[in-house]
Amino acid sequence: MKKIVALLLSLCLVLGAASAMAAGEKIALITMDSIDQHWITLNEGAQKAAEELGVTVTFMSPNTKDDAQQIECVNNAVAGGYQAIIVAANGPDAISSALNEAVEAGVKIVYVDSPANVEAEATFSTDNQAAGKTAGEEMIKALTAAGITSGDIGIVNVNAATDSTVKREAGFRSAFEGTDYNILETQYGEGDAAKSQTIAENYITQGVVGIFGGNEGSTTGIGNAIKASGDTGVIGVGFDKSDAPEPHQGRLPAVHHGSEPRRDGL
């Protein structure tokens, strides 16, 4: 799969913004976790940009989406003498105290994708609400093409706090205003593919016609659930498609990389 060009370009800009610095200085990249393909791709882009700029970028992300681990990563970056931190915050508040301490220590903060409530040098992200609306429109197109003009839609998201995925969900919901579809209460899988699959399987048992995934783990879980369900006709739409083998390929008609939609055959 092609890398997300816009993401790589943003990383170059982020690194430049984070360093009105001399070559050889250190930048910490702290994302929500270190296993989501989105963040792995982000790190790959950061490493390429760092090589061009002559700075060092260290991927210091937690193993899983955990506020305490992310706070520890921020503290370790400050203790390690890093001049800048590029961070995708799990939520707006949890790591704010740690980031404030980093700023007080002279560390520059740059947000990518998901900001916290601490002033930063810059924030780089896609228009997640607009991208979410596009995802909703893609689902409506796919459902209409399948002759489905009403029914329940499930949502599998990460949590109720992460800025980027909350906005994606809001945009997705807005696409269905004035339609005969019914958006069910959101269920949270913490970005974990296995948990998200269980949620999606429950939605399918309830008879939904479509399921939306707010991030890569959610989308992977939805795809696995749709595959396991057989020929149910459930339509899945999600974000941040993985470079890993895709058991849901051909069953997930629209997967979004940042804000750019991609449609696969049904």
Each model region followed by its residue ranges:
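Positively charged n-region of N-terminal signal peptides that target proteins for export
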Residues: 1-9
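A residue-level marker of the well-folded mature domains of exported/periplasmic proteins
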Residues: 4, 13, 20-266
